[in-house]
From Swiss-Prot:
It comes from the Bacteria. It comes from Salmonella choleraesuis (strain SC-B67). One of its GO terms (biological process) is enterobacterial common antigen biosynthetic process. This is Probable ECA polymerase. The chain crosses the membrane at residues 6-26, 37-57, 63-83, 118-138, 155-175, 181-201, 207-227, 228-248, 341-361, 378-398, 410-430. It is a multi-pass membrane protein. The lineage of its organism: Bacteria, Pseudomonadati, Pseudomonadota, Gammaproteobacteria, Enterobacterales. Probably involved in the polymerization of enterobacterial common antigen (ECA) trisaccharide repeat units.
Amino acid sequence: MSVMQFSGLLVVWLLSTLFIATLTWFEFRRVRFNFNVFFSLLFLLTFFFGFPLTSVLVFRFDVGVAPPEILLQALLSAACFYGVYYVTYKTRLRKRVVDVPRKPLFTMNRVETHLTWVILMGIALVSVAIFFMHNGFLLFRLHSYSQIFSSEVSGVALKRFFYFFIPAMLVVYFLRQDSKAWLFFLVSTVAFGLLTYMIVGGTRANIIIAFAIFLFIGIIRGWISLWMLAAAGVLGIVGMFWLALKRYGLNVSGDEAFYTFLYLTRDTFSPWENLALLLQNYHNIEFQGLAPIVRDFYVFIPTWLWPGRPSIVLNSANYFTWEVLNNHSGLAISPTLIGSLVVMGGALFIPLGAIVVGLIIKWFDWLYELGNREPNRYKAAILHSFCFGAIFNMIVLAREGLDSFVSRVVFFLVVFGASLLVAKLLFWLFDSAGLIHKRTTSLPQAQVEGKL
């Protein structure tokens, strides 16, 4: 890459970043937080944060990258995607009407709410315990991270249930919403994330997500400022780098440490070059249509229920890894959101996918606002826990693609909904047995619903 080519890419990167950052800043000033703000920051991180890191790798360490014209296509496709997404998100198909009283779809009381978070926490802890009994501390047993996906490790499906510890702790926080509950959320979820990091052998997702939710709650409540958020972001990047070194068993120093920091940070937070690799091999891609979305559900179906289930799931990430990169190391390489759309339907699917994502984020913001307006604090805690708990799925959306997001959000919805139903069933059984008594302390009517 010549200096002139880099200068052209830099101009496009600056304009695109300024465009997205400006819209995000105006939205932040208007509402302080919603899921449009979160997705916009996540989109910036995924598709634009890595450009400076790539530039240093190219000019400082002479690392090979995709041709400049392909990198330009990656930057422009990301900017155009966001433009279509933003227009979709802001477009209102019908006039806003004054809210009229409607019969609620469901209600929650104190006992049901506490039962819900206990059930969610129980799902996570029992899954961790069973996985640990089968495998022990994988971080100290395995020699490479790819071994996590080998036959040496049993009960891999249980990892999908670990995450429900976070929405459980979110319910606890939203019932109190003070600084002590906020700090308790951080300590409990990060401690659980470190435990799963050691047990699973290097999975950092629970730690990253817990820390991100903690920061956004702090921003919403005004407990942390923007400069504190930036400082926490730097601390988070350094922390994730250290955990990555431990995960891959790397011992580096000097220039090698700087080089390792650059490429690990880029791959962890901003795998934008993966999109460039897909575009570089565009002529070799056999478009998969919507099949990757259907295939991604296969991993949630146990073999005892479907004995003939394919052992290899060809979703967009695996197609990119195996068919495009010809990489069979055992790790799936993230194609990114836009990359998954390219795998499914080429360039035509990029604006269509942007419209779909705009509607998805709009729905989450509608649910979040519903929780903000809800007078029943127990129901509000459940709604907010569901919304913030889905942040993990939005990270999957940006990094892994639309197919992975759809399967995971459906799985999250099913488990969360089942926990609610079980909590209501248990409350009904306890109430029928005469074990539920009304509280003697008088509370505001808006905070009391049903028998407490």
